[in-house]
């Protein structure tokens, strides 16, 4: 892991506020905004995982102490003057940000980085208080301010905004943010874990399983990922069987509609499955009622 700043006391305290699951977020944030839906199973799993992720967390949620002062530079007002409503209603135009940075000096980029850090910490405080809409807005403004060359910082901001959006039940937007965070930092375990949970909540079980497998490849000690890799294959199989039955039912209804003018129905066709191969065969029966 990279170097950790000793002066990152406040962001270090915020780690639990930005945990992947609601239980440990509640432990950090205190009484406000409990979420009983996810408390029943996640706390034990993540207590086992916390020790293994501790080093990763310190680096991911804190990117250096910075000066709070920020002098306005040319072109910055184009980003800063956007309303909070615009920030939250539309996604960032990455190409625009890259174009904006082309003529920036290193000093200007560093100032924008420092301002994005201030906005990130502001969002962290809002998240801890349960002000998730405000936190999302702060992370969005931080993303607009943070130069694209600081990929690690931007990956953290995307992951943090995903957490704020999760709290508002904006699951698809949160998945999109997690994907952007992972694209910028493929080893970002927390973002992968967060996306895996979101995939489960949106019934995208195959995608969730792939993310959990990816986590185990990076760190086999993550208990939540191990448990999911044992649990999800059976759930996926059961879902596929259910979908197959629904599909066959619809095909039967369609078949009856087509065969009815000929005095036939799907009862005239018996479907048998070969237990050894799993394949199906169809046999025509002239008088199906006589075979019962």
From Swiss-Prot:
<dbReference type="InterPro" id="IPR011990">
    <property type="entry name" value="TPR-like_helical_dom_sf"/>
</dbReference>
<dbReference type="GO" id="GO:0006457">
    <property type="term" value="P:protein folding"/>
</dbReference>
<dbReference type="InterPro" id="IPR052769">
    <property type="entry name" value="TPR_domain_protein"/>
</dbReference>
<dbReference type="GO" id="GO:0005829">
    <property type="term" value="C:cytosol"/>
</dbReference>
<feature type="repeat" description="TPR 3">
    <location>
        <begin position="189"/>
        <end position="222"/>
    </location>
</feature>
<protein>
    <recommendedName>
        <fullName>Tetratricopeptide repeat protein 1</fullName>
    </recommendedName>
</protein>
<feature type="repeat" description="TPR 1">
    <location>
        <begin position="116"/>
        <end position="149"/>
    </location>
</feature>
<feature type="compositionally biased region" description="Basic and acidic residues">
    <location>
        <begin position="75"/>
        <end position="85"/>
    </location>
</feature>
<keyword id="KW-0677">Repeat</keyword>
<dbReference type="GO" id="GO:0051082">
    <property type="term" value="F:unfolded protein binding"/>
</dbReference>
<feature type="modified residue" description="Phosphoserine">
    <location>
        <position position="83"/>
    </location>
</feature>
<dbReference type="Pfam" id="PF00515">
    <property type="entry name" value="TPR_1"/>
</dbReference>
<feature type="modified residue" description="Phosphoserine">
    <location>
        <position position="90"/>
    </location>
</feature>
<dbReference type="Pfam" id="PF13181">
    <property type="entry name" value="TPR_8"/>
</dbReference>
<feature type="compositionally biased region" description="Basic and acidic residues">
    <location>
        <begin position="45"/>
        <end position="55"/>
    </location>
</feature>
<dbReference type="GO" id="GO:0005778">
    <property type="term" value="C:peroxisomal membrane"/>
</dbReference>
<comment type="subunit">
    <text>Interacts with the GAP domain of NF1. Interacts (via TPR repeats) with HSP90AA1 and HSPA8.</text>
</comment>
<feature type="region of interest" description="Disordered">
    <location>
        <begin position="23"/>
        <end position="125"/>
    </location>
</feature>
<keyword id="KW-0802">TPR repeat</keyword>
<dbReference type="InterPro" id="IPR019734">
    <property type="entry name" value="TPR_rpt"/>
</dbReference>
<keyword id="KW-0597">Phosphoprotein</keyword>
<feature type="compositionally biased region" description="Basic and acidic residues">
    <location>
        <begin position="99"/>
        <end position="125"/>
    </location>
</feature>
<feature type="repeat" description="TPR 2">
    <location>
        <begin position="155"/>
        <end position="188"/>
    </location>
</feature>
């Amino acid at each position: 892991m990279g170097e950790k700043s000793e002066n990152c006391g406040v962001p270090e305290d915020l780690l639990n506020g930005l945990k992947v699951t609601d239980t440990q977020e509640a432990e950090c944030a205190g009484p406000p905004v409990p979420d009983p839906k996810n408390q029943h199973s996640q706390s034990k799993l993540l207590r086992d995982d916390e020790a293994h992720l501790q080093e990763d967390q310190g680096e991911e949620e804190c990117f250096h102490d910075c000066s709070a002062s920020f002098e306005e530079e040319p072109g910055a007002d184009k980003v800063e003057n956007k309303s909070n409503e615009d920030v939250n209603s539309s996604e960032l135009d990455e190409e625009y940000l890259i174009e904006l940075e082309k003529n920036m000096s290193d000093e200007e980029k560093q100032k924008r980085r420092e301002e994005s850090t201030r906005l990130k910490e502001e969002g962290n405080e809002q998240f801890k208080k349960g002000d998730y809409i405000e936190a999302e807005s702060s992370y969005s403004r931080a993303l607009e301010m943070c130069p694209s060359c600081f990929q690690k910082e931007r990956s953290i901001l995307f992951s943090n905004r995903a957490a704020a959006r999760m709290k508002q039940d904006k699951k698809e937007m949160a998945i999109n943010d997690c994907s952007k965070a992972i694209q910028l930092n493929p080893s970002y375990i927390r973002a992968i874990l967060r996306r895996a949970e979101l995939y489960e909540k949106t019934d995208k079980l195959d995608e969730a399983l792939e993310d959990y497998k990816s986590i185990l490849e990076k760190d086999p000690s993550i208990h939540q990922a191990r448990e999911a890799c044992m649990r999800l294959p059976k759930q996926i199989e059961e879902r596929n069987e259910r979908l197959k039955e629904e599909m066959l039912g619809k095909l039967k209804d369609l078949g009856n509609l087509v065969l009815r003018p000929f005095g036939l129905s799907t009862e005239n066709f018996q479907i048998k499955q070969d237990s050894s191969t799993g394949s199906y065969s169809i046999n025509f029966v002239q008088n199906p009622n006589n075979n019962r």
